[in-house]
Structures are given as C-alpha cells and as structure tokens.
UniProtKB/Swiss-Prot annotation:
Chlorophyll a 3 binds at Q140, L150, E216. GO terms for molecular function: chlorophyll binding; metal ion binding. Chlorophyll b 5 binds at F264. It is a multi-pass membrane protein. The light-harvesting complex (LHC) functions as a light receptor, it captures and delivers excitation energy to photosystems with which it is closely associated. Residues 1-40 form a transit peptide. Keywords: Chlorophyll, Chloroplast, Chromophore, Magnesium, Membrane, Metal-binding, Phosphoprotein, Photosynthesis, Photosystem I, Photosystem II, Plastid, Thylakoid, Transit peptide, Transmembrane, Transmembrane helix. This is Chlorophyll a-b binding protein AB10, chloroplastic. The chain crosses the membrane at residues 108-125, 155-175, 222-238. Chlorophyll a 5 binds at K215, Q233. It comes from the Eukaryota. One of its GO terms (cellular component) is chloroplast thylakoid membrane.
Length: 268
C-alpha cells in the first residue's frame, strides 16, 4: 500500500504540505483535508518518537518472539528480518562483503540446483543426454573416454580437468571482472544488480523490482540448503535425487536422513 510511504514522507518533510499547497489553487475542502491529514500524521509521529526506519512494517524472523531490532539493521536491503545473533553485520564493510557473497552464492546455488534436478527429470521422461546424475556426469572427465557435453561427442569432448578449470576461470573471471569494476565506462551503478538483462521487463516497476530482490534472496537461501543436501545425499547414498525421493516415500521409516547417516561408513 502507498499510505505508509506517504506517512513517512510527511513525517520527514513537515513543509511538504506547504510546498504542495502553495503553487496550486486548492478549494477549501481539499486544503482542509490535506492540512488535517498532515497535522494528524505529524502529531502521531511526535507522540511515538520513532525514526523513519521504524515506520516500515518489516516481518521479524521469529515474529513477536524476535526481540529488538539490531540498530544497524535498518531494513534497507532485501531479506532483512532482523536476525543477526552473531553480530556479523555490525560493521558496514563486513556487512557489504557478506551481503555480496550471499547474493552471488544464492544465484549460483539456484542454477546448480536446477542443473542437478532437470537432467534427472529428462532422463525419467526418456529424453536424457548421457549420464543424468550430476556427480556421476562430472566424474566422467576422469574416465578414459572423457566427458561429452549434453552426451553428444560432436559438441564438446572434454578430456582434461585442467582445460575445463581454465576455461571456467577465464569466462567467469571476465563476467565477474566486469561486474566488480562497474563496467569499462562505469555504467554499472550497483555491482549486485548490474542490469542490461531484463528482456521481460520485470524490473521496470520500482516496487516490483524490490519484491523480486526479496524473492531472489529467499529462493537463493533455499537453494543453498538444497545443494548442501544434494552433497550429503551423494556422499551417503550414492544415488540420484529422484531415486532417493522414491525410496523415502516408499518406506519412510527405513529410508530417511537418520537411518542413512547412522549406517554410513566412510570409504564404502
């Protein structure tokens, strides 16, 4: 809603009513409504004695049991729910670094989670491209035949892990270098959101863009937990994600995280 935003604006700018009403010719009814609303908001702000940062309606991470907000968490950035028990965001430089790491890792985790699940779904539907299990597909680089991208030897036939790492460092280094350096001409204003990629026009509206930032971070945090779960499943069960899910749904008591971890023997 736009009402809270209007309240904050008038609280921060007491002369706003005068500046708006002075150039225009308002009828007595409109003038009375504007002045009355303005003084009502100013009176409420003076009575509550709160700053503009507390005029928002942020959701707390534990609801009414969350306690007080840390003074340095003002709600300026997406995904801020007032949770920082370790004080990791107390210093602005550390907070900026951790925030950048979280956003970048979130995007990588979302892409990785999709890359782990999608080939398995295609394989189940009979549209597989070679090895569908993500950790087995990557391990093919160490086999005698090497690794075929998309299961097609006529595309990219990789046989050297060093060549793959070198290619990734060059490609990702160029992209990250452009982002961190804010472009060759300084055209990038925010390294976390460099822009120039919005073919669907999703970020044209300011409020919609702010909401998408929150959704990106929420889904990114879930994706990071998902990838951690994928790593543990691969080490413990040596099965793909869909097979693990089918085993769990088929016999939940015998196939769950606790039973797999307790029966896990490293090296076997």
């Amino acid at each position: 809603m736009y009402i809270p935003r209007l309240s904050v604006s008038i609280c921060l700018h007491p002369l706003l009513i005068y500046k708006i009403a002075k150039p225009s010719k308002l009828n007595p009814i409109s003038s009375t409504l504007i002045v009355t609303a303005g003084f009502t908001m100013l009176k409420h702000a003076a009575k509550s004695k709160v700053s503009s940062s507390t005029c928002d309606r942020r959701v707390k991470y534990l609801g009414p049991f969350s306690g007080e907000w840390p003074s340095y968490l003002t709600g300026e950035f997406p995904g801020d729910y007032g949770w920082d028990t370790a004080g990791l965001s107390a210093y602005p430089e550390t907070f900026a670094k951790n925030r950048e790491l979280e956003v970048i890792h979130s995007r990588c985790a979302m892409s990785a989670a999709l890359g782990c699940i999608f080939p398995e779904l295609l394989s189940v539907m009979g549209q597989g491209f070679g090895e569908a299990v993500w950790f087995k597909a990557g391990a093919q680089i160490f086999s005698e035949g090497g690794l075929d991208y998309l299961g097609n030897p006529s595309l990219v036939h990789a046989q050297s892990i060093l060549a793959i790492w070198t290619t990734k460092v060059i490609l990702m280094g160029a992209v990250e270098g452009y982002r961190i350096a804010r472009g060759p001409l300084g055209e990038v204003t925010d390294p976390l959101y460099p822009g120039s990629f919005d073919s669907l026009g999703l970020a044209e509206d300011t409020e919609a863009f702010a909401e998408l930032k929150v959704k990106e971070l929420k889904n990114g945090r879930l994706a990071m937990f998902s990838m951690f779960g994928f790593f543990v499943q691969a080490i413990v069960s040596r099965k793909d994600r869909l097979e693990n899910l089918a085993d769990h749904l088929g016999w939940t008591v015998n196939n769950n995280a606790l039973s797999n971890v307790t029966n896990f023997v490293p090296g076997n």
